[in-house]
């Protein structure tokens, strides 16, 4: 876990409620600058990683839409934050901003009221599906890493408490960090944490400034013991050859990863653990940016002979593995799971 201590805090006037003021008080030595909009920042004169290390933004989330997912959760909750300390080379959040520091939204009560109103309008009991057998699930961390945000504002714990006490709703988020402060909270199995996993040597290259795969795997038993439901997120799956041209290198590395997972987890933890699997989608703008800041990663991410292009819903040019090849890759991955960790149910894979 990084020790995030911003030297500059940008804030909008409407973000300075009691929670916003508490965040400012947490970092008394930071320079403060009021801005008109949290998502239109002035020129900061810092590079990509410096902004993530040194800048924090406080804002008020005005558009609190709840969006259907059907994959990681039933619904995507309004964002509690946007941006991350990490610098993952494939992150879709970074695609839409020139710089992307952590932005905390301080109107947490309005967020929870939106969720309560939304879930109360849904059918009950909930129809059983792959997201959860009992509760309507909401992904609370699609645009940030909640493990980092948790230490920056008490609002995240308040959100955890809201879901723990709610008779119909359950929270979930994916993370690439191990924040052991979360172990002091009792989530009553109403918060599902999903540790993102990939082969360790690949993670070191593309999961920039995040906790190691070894740390993430080692934390799974502990988070289960603390009362969390724990799943894993094999995402993104990156297909690559070895230095010697071995096209099965990615398969062999995932086999080793699965064996590490099988060895590390206790039987009762395995029994409740499920996985989601998402193969890589990359972006042309991000590819160009990475060539300047992390060109080695692009040797894995940008492989035109394996990929096809598509236009995203935002009008960007994305690439993904070619359809026929990907169908085979999916079957290979499912086969590896069945061979090495047959106890791990795949919730969805694409």
Specify the residue positions occupied by each region the protein language model found:
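Flexible, acidic/Gly-rich N-terminal and inter-domain linker regions that tether
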Residues: 1-74
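Auxiliary Fe-S-binding modules of radical SAM enzymes
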Residues: 1-20, 256-350
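Well-ordered, non-membrane alpha-helical segments in soluble/globular domains
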Residues: 17-20, 108-118, 153-159, 210-219, ...
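Conserved Radical SAM active-site core
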Residues: 57-72, 93-196
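Local cysteine-cluster metal-coordination motifs and their immediate loop/turn environment
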Residues: 79-96
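Structural preference for beta-strand elements that scaffold enzyme active sites
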Residues: 135-139, 170-172, 190-194, 229-233, ...
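Conserved radical SAM core fold
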Residues: 143-148, 178-182, 191-210, 236-244, ...
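Conserved C-terminal portion of the radical SAM core fold
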Residues: 215-287
